[in-house]
Amino acid sequence: MAEATNQVAVANGHENEDNNDHLIQSSDPQHPANLIPEMCRKFYTWGWVTGTGGGTSIRHGDHIFIAPSGVQKELIQPENMFVMQFPTPKYPPSERKYIRKPKNLKPSDCTPLFLTAFERGAGCCIHTHSQWAVLVTLLVEREYGKEGYFEISNIEQIKGIPKGKGKGMHNYHDTLRIPIIENTPFEEDLTEGLERAINANPDTYAVLVRRHGIYVWGDTPAKAKTQCESLDWLFQLAVEMHKLGLPWDINKTK
């Protein structure tokens, strides 16, 4: 375990004198450099970021903090954070404005997808490889085809998901609809599909990726986290309901 920890907690690079290390040094537990590692540790215990998968990013003023790619998420430390200037170009990658890069770590493959959420006003974006998210994408495809949405109604927990910017939260009787996009061989190639899904569903705060996972965002880290929790609970419930032959969306059966 010590060797694995060292793999993640490597020394920072020094392309300039201090590599802007002051950006990730804070005693405040809510500072993004401290909060992202704490969130990733929780997500690991929930099975959301197993095997280095998934990621988390927080926008803090005109800075974006991003966990590195290809590392064990439960071992991430504040010094492992990448920091970008915001706004910043999504493409080409060489034009992205990194103002802090830890040595020997790779920028997240999720970066352009996180930027897509931030361009729409999000304060935090979470990407998980939840098994429940993957399963509901497969069930929707089998029952409704590749154009189908995940839809569920008359379940108390949908009240934890916003209806859209400034529109309040879903009510118990509402139908929650989450769009699903197709997976791609490389994470960054999901960006176009994510953008299309958001443009077609401007009120959504989440997009499922078939056979892959989900992207969830919120106005703040706390809102993104609780929305992701609510959705994952609903996905697990939906899988169990399907086993029992119970409909997800009662509004469709009326």
Swiss-Prot record:
User: What pathway does this protein act in?
Assistant: Amino-acid biosynthesis; L-methionine biosynthesis via salvage pathway; L-methionine from S-methyl-5-thio-alpha-D-ribose 1-phosphate: step 2/6
Give residues annotated as binding substrate: 110
> Taking the first listed entry, what is the main subcellular location of this protein, grouped into a coarse class?
cytoplasm
Question: GO molecular function, one example?
Answer: methylthioribulose 1-phosphate dehydratase activity
The source's domain of life comes to Eukaryota
Compartmental location: Cytoplasm
Q: What class of enzyme is it?
A: lyase
Locate the coiled-coil region(s) and give their ranges. Answer: none
Does the record carry Amino-acid biosynthesis as a key word? yes
Q: Where is the active site?
A: 156
Report which reactions are catalysed by this protein: 5-(methylsulfanyl)-D-ribulose 1-phosphate = 5-methylsulfanyl-2,3-dioxopentyl phosphate + H2O
Determine if Amino-acid biosynthesis is one of this entry's keywords.
yes
**Keyword vocabulary terms for this entry:** Amino-acid biosynthesis, Cytoplasm, Lyase, Metal-binding, Methionine biosynthesis, Zinc
The terms describing its cellular component in GO are:
cytoplasm
Q: Which cofactor does it need?
A: Zn(2+)
Q: Which HAMAP family match?
A: Salvage_MtnB_euk (MF_03116)
* PANTHER family attached to this UniProt entry: METHYLTHIORIBULOSE-1-PHOSPHATE DEHYDRATASE (PTHR10640:SF7)
Q: What is this protein called?
A: Methylthioribulose-1-phosphate dehydratase
Species assigned in the record: Talaromyces marneffei (strain ATCC 18224 / CBS 334.59 / QM 7333) (Penicillium marneffei)
Which gene is transcribed and translated to give this protein? mde1
